[in-house]
Design a protein with these regions (language model features):
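Charged helix-capping and loop-helix junction motifs
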Residues: 44, 121-130, 156-161
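Acidic (Asp/Glu)-rich catalytic clusters
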Residues: 52-55, 75, 79-80, 99-106, ...
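Active-site beta-loop-alpha junctions enriched in small/polar residues
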Residues: 1-4, 66, 90-93, 112-116, ...
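Divalent metal-binding pocket/active-site signature
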Residues: 1-95
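Short acidic/histidine-rich active-site segments
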Residues: 137-154
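Structural preference for beta-strand elements that scaffold enzyme active sites
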Residues: 60-62, 84-86, 106-110, 139-141
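Mid-to-C-terminal alpha-helical segments outside catalytic/metal-binding sites
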Residues: 158-199
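Divalent metal-coordination and catalytic microenvironments
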Residues: 1, 61, 109, 145, ...
């Protein structure tokens, strides 16, 4: 099948990303003061400390599960410091206008294939496709967010997610960019070889 190479490259990029990023996982528990300061466009000192660590280790800031105004405050400062960033789970709670603003800062926008396994999967997948098109394929990263016992294994799930993207009209080249090239660029990897047959 013509998209088999896309699945192969996607799996490779995902595994490379996991190996490189797991070394620098830092979890921060948000509190009310942090939320208030972010609403005013400020960050608590701990955020600056974490951004310093990320910069020192050439690591990636993966931010999600916080309010859009907090996201903007954090990622503006990350951009100012030269920290590569991705906003996770953008399809859930980050308005398209905010995604566009983040993309303009050089932030990658992650969209999770977990939506393909929800009860309302058709509508969720269509909504994600619309968001990707509104912001631009060049800013999108498509991952799975899988790993739960009731869902498929991540490599299988990524193949299903790729099929969903193709059904939404994305080309093989666009899918490859979202599942391989953009993740590779995020983690600072070298450009990949072209797919077999130059597609």
């Amino acid at each position: 099948q013509q998209y088999d190479w896309v699945r192969l490259f996607a799996h490779t990029a995902q595994m490379e990303g996991i190996k490189n990023l797991q070394r620098f996982r830092i979890n921060v528990v948000p509190d009310a003061m942090a939320a208030q300061q972010a609403a005013a466009g400020n960050l608590v000192p701990a955020c600056h400390d974490i951004l310093d660590l990320l910069h020192a280790h050439d690591a990636v800031l993966a931010s999600g599960h916080i309010a859009p105004n907090e996201t903007l405050a954090l990622l503006r400062e990350a951009r100012r410091r030269g920290v590569r960033s991705v906003i996770t789970h953008a399809s859930f709670g980050i308005p398209v206008e905010v995604q566009q603003e983040l993309a303009a800062l050089g932030v990658f926008i992650e969209h999770c294939g977990l939506a393909a396994f929800r009860a309302d999967d058709g509508e969720s997948v269509r909504s994600i496709a619309e968001q990707i098109r509104a912001v631009g394929v060049e800013h999108a990263i498509c991952s799975t967010d899988l790993g739960q016992a009731q869902n498929p294994d991540p490599p299988l799930g990524l193949g299903i997610w790729i099929d969903c993207l193709i059904e939404q009209g994305f080309t093989a080249s666009e899918v490859r960019q979202m599942v391989q090239e953009n993740p590779r660029a995020l983690i600072g990897g070298p450009p990949s070889l072209p797919p077999p047959g130059g597609h």
